[in-house]
Amino acid sequence: MTSWPPRIVIRRSSGLRTMESALVRSGLGPVAGVDEAGRGACAGPLVVAACVLAPKPYPALARLDDSKKLTERTREELFPAITRLAVAWSVVSFPAEEVDRMGVHVANIEGMRRAVAGLSTTPGYVLTDGFRVPGLPAPSLPVIGGDAAAACIAAASVLAKVSRDRVMVAMDETHPGYGFAIHKGYNTPAHLTALEKLGPCPEHRRSWSNVAALIHRVDNSSGSAR
């Protein structure tokens, strides 16, 4: 009888495919990896991706790693390779307004559910990056630092990151002045300076403390001026 989660010896030094291979050998494949991009940003969408890779080596994906460790150019080069070679992949997005309404953690969990549900292949097991996701259609295991430990999570992290970055570059055209194409909505000094100067745009998350504080100051200033 298989225990849940199964007891597997994982040697991270053996490479990114070790975890999936162990699960597949235990009869638990196909294995899906899930990851997000934009959780900590104060502007733009939260994007979640799921990906299933076949349990075999892919020379075209040799550079696969945690998307945050890769250059933008490498991520862009890996993106079409992942979408071409993956058994299945799925990307879902929650706009800023929906993140505010749901809360970022709830949106993240729901995004992971939707991304897995959107796969064209039903996974036998799901690896998530960092925390438990209830309500998935298959047994799952949270993996701390999963995007650097499992290839399917690393692939999902690239899909989510590239998809979101492209949205932020386009957003820079519709909302100029904030530098979205550069900082991608994260709280960099340049972004915070632009936010103070221009005020929030519709793509800023009102539930974020720095955005909410700015709105509060503006409202108070407007009230005292009347």
Swiss-Prot record:
State the GO CC annotations.
cytoplasm; ribonuclease H2 complex
Which keywords does this Swiss-Prot/TrEMBL entry list? Cytoplasm, Endonuclease, Hydrolase, Manganese, Metal-binding, Nuclease
Q: Cite a single Pfam family from the UniProt record.
A: RNase_HII
This entry's Enzyme Commission designation comes to 3.1.26.4
Give compartment(s): Cytoplasm
Which coenzyme or cofactor does it need? Mn(2+); Mg(2+)
What residues bind a divalent metal cation, as annotated? D35, E36, D129
Main location class? cytoplasm
Spell out the molecular function terms from Gene Ontology.
Answer: manganese ion binding; RNA binding; RNA-DNA hybrid ribonuclease activity
- Enumerate the spans annotated as RNase H type-2 domain: 29-220
Q: Report the cofactor remark.
A: Manganese or magnesium. Binds 1 divalent metal ion per monomer in the absence of substrate. May bind a second metal ion after substrate binding.
Q: In terms of domain of life, where is this protein from?
A: Bacteria
Q: Which GO terms describe its biological process?
A: DNA replication, removal of RNA primer; mismatch repair
Q: Does the keyword NAD apply?
A: no
Kindly state which reaction or reactions the protein catalyses: Endonucleolytic cleavage to 5'-phosphomonoester
Which ranges of the sequence are coiled-coil?
Answer: none
Give the matching InterPro entries. Answer: RNase_HII (IPR022898), RNase_HII/HIII (IPR001352), RNase_HII/HIII_dom (IPR024567), RNaseH-like_sf (IPR012337), RNaseH_sf (IPR036397)
What NCBIfam families does this protein's entry cite?
A: PRK00015.1-3, PRK00015.2-2, PRK00015.2-4
- Similarity-based family: Belongs to the RNase HII family.
Role, per record: Endonuclease that specifically degrades the RNA of RNA-DNA hybrids.
Q: Which HAMAP family match?
A: RNase_HII_B
Q: What is the protein's given name?
A: Ribonuclease HII
